[in-house]
């Protein structure tokens, strides 16, 4: 009975607090070495969760970088994290230690969404045989269906024509271009995966685009961070279904499309699309428990392609049009180069890119300035590594701050301004920058980079060949500030598209 009186309750409370503090202290033992990266002192149990602004992580990390240096530490709950900033340190991690930092940390919320040891897709997969198998398949199949070849270029050019038709239908009006751009890029991915496209007013396409956006919103921000930090919360009945409702609905929609594709698949015929090619591999892998070719992983690979291949490029183009209406002189100079190299009748082709240094520089500067994936996806150390004279232990989550590279004051002349001359020499020739890495670097660099580069060039040049874009009369000048999520998109804005006349 003494346990239930005031003295007993106080004793139990004190014992519990001491026990938690001892456990917390043991979880901090990685900090006991003098060569562990410095950082703010974490709170017991919570770590640094309340010391960073999750709604604007890049700015929080920018301030911490200036206080603690290019390599510093944080703690998420009891999980150690190291933030890597600026070109030299980032290259050291992604390239010099590429093999040792190619893994992904465990992410509890993704287990609720169907990620399992043999069904991790490509982007979230642990670094190992399954990841190699799926990356090799994805790259090979994308090449088969035209990545870097004329066939895919024709698909993209045709879709760019449909996009231009959609803009023409609303020429002279005040519109938000985001929805149309998302639909166009969704159709490119749907062509690769299912060999089909949708009309822009098709309710199925509209719903698909909406669900992709919702699913990305659901896995970024404060709530997912809390759930990943304290995964026991995911055991609360019904919580995961409520928090990730859009993601689960999107997967159900994809399941219907995959089932539809399967009913018309003929194994005796050459594959029509990526889904057919994957199903053929599933048949070959039957009886092999070590293979990652299974129906569950097909779904995860398709989710990867839609989320990474659609929204990222559409968001970059949304930034591009925003910057064109804010910098009309840049827009006119791009149009002048288009007129000189391509003209106003012929469709742009990838072979034109080599003869269009200014347009190429503008596209690269849009990617640098837009900075749509500032923190990339986290990495995980598979062994102890040494970076910038610091020792980072095995099992540490690495956050690669690409924003600190793309906007490094020691590299770029005007890091926080839109300045296409960053990619031009004194003679006006296009120049590459080693600090330009919007697709990351190393072993886990974006596998869809060639496709994204093709889409950006063809869509951007097609649009500026056909239209002049401006801020609508009576509308305020849009902001160049982005909204931190994945991907980082500009704040909603309106533009007016006017069909260009010959010679204008």
UniProtKB/Swiss-Prot annotation:
It is found in: Endoplasmic reticulum membrane; Microsome membrane. It catalyses: an organic molecule + reduced [NADPH--hemoprotein reductase] + O2 = an alcohol + oxidized [NADPH--hemoprotein reductase] + H2O + H(+). Heme binds at residue 446. It comes from the Eukaryota. It is an enzyme of class 1 (oxidoreductase). It is a peripheral membrane protein. GO terms for cellular component: cytoplasm; endoplasmic reticulum membrane; intracellular membrane-bounded organelle; mitochondrion. Its EC number is 1.14.14.1. Induction: P450 can be induced to high levels in liver and other tissues by various foreign compounds, including drugs, pesticides, and carcinogens. Pfam families: p450. The keyword Iron applies. GO terms for biological process: arachidonate metabolic process; response to nicotine; response to xenobiotic stimulus; xenobiotic catabolic process; xenobiotic metabolic process. InterPro entries: Cyt_P450, Cyt_P450_CS, Cyt_P450_E_grp-I, Cyt_P450_E_grp-I_CYP2D-like, Cyt_P450_sf, Cytochrome_P450_fam2. Its cofactor is heme. Belongs to the cytochrome P450 family. This is Cytochrome P450 2D1. It comes from Rattus norvegicus (Rat). The lineage of its organism: Eukaryota, Metazoa, Chordata, Craniata, Vertebrata. The gene is Cyp2d1.
């Amino acid at each position: 009975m003494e346990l239930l009186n005031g003295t007993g309750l106080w004793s139990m409370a004190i014992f519990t607090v001491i026990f938690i503090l001892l456990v917390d202290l043991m979880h901090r033992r990685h900090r006991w070495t003098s060569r562990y990266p410095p950082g703010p002192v974490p709170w017991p149990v919570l770590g640094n969760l309340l010391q960073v602004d999750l709604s604007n992580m890049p700015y929080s990390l920018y301030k911490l970088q200036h206080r603690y240096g290019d390599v510093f530490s944080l703690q998420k709950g009891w999980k150690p994290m190291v933030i890597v900033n600026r070109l030299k340190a980032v290259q050291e991690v992604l390239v010099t230690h590429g093999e040792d930092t190619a893994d992904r940390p465990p992410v509890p919320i993704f287990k609720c969404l169907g990620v399992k040891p043999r069904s991790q897709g490509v982007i979230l997969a642990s670094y190992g045989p399954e990841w190699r198998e799926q990356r090799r398949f994805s790259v090979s199949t994308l090449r088969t269906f035209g990545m870097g070849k004329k066939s895919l270029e024709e698909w993209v050019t045709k879709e760019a024509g449909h996009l231009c038709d959609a803009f023409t239908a609303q020429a002279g009006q005040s519109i938000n271009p985001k929805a149309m751009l998302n639909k166009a890029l969704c159709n490119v991915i749907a062509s690769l995966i299912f060999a089909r496209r949708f009309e822009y007013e098709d309710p199925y396409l509209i719903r698909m685009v909406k669900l992709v956006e919702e699913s990305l919103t659901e896995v970024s921000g404060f709530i997912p961070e809390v759930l990943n930090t304290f995964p026991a919360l995911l055991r609360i009945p019904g919580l995961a279904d409520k928090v990730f409702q859009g993601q689960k609905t999107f997967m159900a929609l994809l399941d219907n499309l995959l089932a539809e594709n399967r009913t018309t698949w003929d194994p005796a015929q050459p594959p029509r699309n990526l889904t057919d090619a994957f199903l053929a591999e599933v048949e070959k892998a039957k009886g092999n428990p070590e293979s990652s070719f299974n129906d569950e992983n097909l779904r995860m690979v398709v989710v990867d392609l839609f989320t990474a291949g659609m929204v990222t490029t559409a968001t970059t183009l949304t930034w591009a049009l925003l910057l064109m209406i804010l910098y009309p002189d840049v827009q006119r100079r791009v149009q002048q180069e288009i007129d000189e190299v391509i003209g106003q009748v012929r469709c742009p082709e990838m072979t034109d890119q080599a003869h269009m240094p200014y347009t190429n520089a503008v596209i690269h500067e849009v990617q640098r300035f837009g900075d749509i994936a500032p923190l990339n996806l986290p990495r995980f150390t598979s062994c102890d590594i040494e970076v910038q004279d610091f020792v980072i232990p095995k099992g540490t989550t690495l956050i690669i701050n690409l924003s600190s590279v793309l906007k490094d004051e020691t590299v770029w002349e005007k890091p926080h301004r839109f300045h296409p001359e960053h990619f031009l020499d004194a003679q006006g020739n296009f120049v590459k920058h080693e600090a330009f890495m919007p697709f990351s670097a190393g072993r886990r660099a974006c596998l869809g980079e060639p496709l994204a580069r093709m889409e950006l060039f063809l869509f951007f040049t097609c649009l500026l060949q056909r239209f002049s874009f401006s801020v609508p009369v009576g509308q305020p000048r849009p902001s160049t500030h982005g909204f931190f999520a994945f991907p980082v998109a500009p704040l909603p804005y309106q533009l007016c598209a006017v069909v260009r006349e010959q010679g204008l």
